[in-house]
Amino acid sequence: MNIPLTPLRFLRYPEQQFPRKTALVCGDKRFSYAEFGARVGQLAGVLRSLGVQTEDRVAFRSTNCHRLLEAYYGVLEAGGVLLPLNIRLSPQELAYVLNDAGVTTLFLESAFLPLAEAFRNSVSLIKNFVLLDGPPQTSWLMPQNYDDLLSAATPLRRDLMAVEENSLAELFYASGTSANPKGVMLTHRNLHLHALSVALAMKSSHETIELHTIPLFHANGWGAAHLITFLGGTHVMIHRFDPAEVFRHPTPYLALDCE
């Protein structure tokens, strides 16, 4: 029997084995593995209700937050391909990436709405705009925001035995220092094996608490979005890494009670 390799397996295990353990911390929000998994299933249900089909590109323009981490599993559960967007790209670069990747659904934080206005009319394939935070923006075809959609969603989880491990799972764009940004394609198998190899090299364990200082859109966050879940550790998300702020008030990060 061939068992497909996919990072979706990483979340299923801690959901079942230690559902009450803290999986994710973001500001004053904490989610157990059971709650994390439930939100992932709700996101997958939202995407399917929006018409996302197998290998449709779903982009997130977001700083590090719990919603972006949920996308690393929810988009794949829906059969889509996740594209975390570099928040430092110009409107022209963003329009190029969105069109080149064929993105059909875009999630974005409210802070990026003014910038997004500059490329909105330059993208042709996007059918769905979803606001990650803040009040709904009807002028942007966003009658509901992310959490509203999740609360009304019918949860969806994939049959992992039906996953094609060599199918595309995530898509990242390099900076394009000499030309336009170039897409980097990662399969389910790529992501699964990378997490396993890094876990062995770093000698990490279920006690690991990862402060995500690297943006998840940068080099896939060095794989930490999947590595920590695979270990059954705890993700700690901060929107922007400010060294002075972290070391001025280190207690929330260094003394987390995550059990």
Predicted regions and their residues:
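Conserved AMP-binding/adenylation subdomain of ANL enzymes
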Residues: 192-209, 217-257
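Conserved AMP-binding/adenylate-forming core of the ANL superfamily
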Residues: 3, 20-65, 69-73, 90-95, ...
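Structural core segment of the AMP-binding/adenylate-forming
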Residues: 49-50, 77-148
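A short helix-loop-beta submotif of the ANL/AMP-binding
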Residues: 44, 57, 63-83, 87-91, ...
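Conserved pre-ATP/AMP-binding loop-to-beta segment of ANL
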Residues: 19, 136, 151-173, 180, ...
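Adenylate-forming
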Residues: 63, 108-117, 214, 239-242, ...
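Conserved AMP-binding A3 loop
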Residues: 32-34, 169-193
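Conserved S/T- and glycine-rich ATP-binding loop of Class I adenylate-forming
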Residues: 58, 75, 106, 168, ...
